[in-house]
């Protein structure tokens, strides 16, 4: 209980820091020290780490502000039939090839209060993520653990769901690339319904082609994902619009 109370204080502090940091980020942009960015993805199917979400094609916008090594951003997802909604806010800091990230996941249904932050009542999920990108080879490794919020096991205790993945990208040229990801979970977490200590949950292959339409670059990605734990697979297409 003492640990959970400390984590609760930590999360509330982080939330307040984010609110405090945002005006500074906006001021940095006005002074030329930051750069806004954004994109909108249209996907025929949304999958996250081998887990499907929604029942129809999905719109996924991103807006953010980059200030050197520091990033703050918002990411959202809504499907066309309104069976799935998600709004995330992230903070990240990059040092050379290592990126540390704190992500808050929230699913804004009408009954859920975005400001309900108590660990046993909130529908927020907070994850700490680390990603390392190798310098000489196009390989990355990522690890993430949920440290707070709506990630409870069958006993009602914090599960600390943990996921690792390794990925490889091969660029044929400036317009064509192929990537592959293998991901697995450790501990009895959300990826295996809080029942198994280990599970391979995400095997994904993607081919991306950069098209030019009216002098505008339009990346199109064809993906195939197989989740061995669920024994299910999906093929889907994503179009990306950046600004």
Residue spans for each PLM region:
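Short glycine/proline- and aromatic-enriched beta-strand/turn motifs that initiate or cap beta-hairpins
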Residues: 28-79
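Short loop/turn motifs that connect adjacent beta-strands in outer-membrane beta-barrel proteins
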Residues: 29-35, 97, 135-138, 170-179, ...
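Residues that define the transmembrane beta-barrel architecture of outer-membrane proteins
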Residues: 34-36, 55-59, 66, 83-87, ...
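Transmembrane beta-strand segments that form the barrel wall of outer-membrane beta-barrel proteins
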Residues: 40-46, 69-80, 100-113, 139-149, ...
């Amino acid at each position: 209980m003492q640990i959970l109370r400390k984590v609760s204080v930590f999360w509330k502090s982080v939330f307040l820091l984010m609110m405090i940091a945002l005006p500074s980020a906006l001021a940095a942009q006005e002074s030329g020290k930051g750069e806004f960015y954004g994109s909108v993805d249209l996907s025929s199917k949304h999958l996250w780490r081998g887990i499907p979400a929604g029942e129809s094609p999905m719109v996924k916008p991103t807006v953010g502000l980059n200030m050197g090594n520091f990033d703050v951003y918002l990411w959202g997802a809504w499907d066309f039939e309104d069976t799935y909604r998600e709004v995330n806010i992230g903070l990240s800091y990059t040092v050379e090839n290592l990126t540390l990230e704190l992500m808050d996941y929230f699913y804004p249904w009408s009954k859920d209060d975005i400001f309900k932050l108590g660990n046993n009542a909130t529908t927020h999920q907070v994850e700490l993520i680390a990603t390392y990108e190798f310098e000489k080879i196009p390989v990355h490794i990522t690890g993430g653990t949920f440290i707070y919020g709506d990630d409870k096991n069958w006993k009602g205790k914090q599960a600390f769901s943990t996921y690792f993945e390794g990925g490889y990208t091969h660029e044929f040229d400036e317009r064509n690339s192929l990537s592959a990801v293998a991901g697995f979970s450790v501990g009895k977490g959300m990826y295996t319904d809080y029942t198994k200590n280990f599970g391979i949950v995400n095997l994904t292959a993607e081919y991306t082609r950069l098209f030019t339409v009216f002098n505008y670059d339009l990346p199109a990605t064809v993906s195939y994902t197989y989740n061995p734990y669920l024994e299910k697979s999906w093929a889907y297409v994503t179009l990306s619009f950046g600004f």
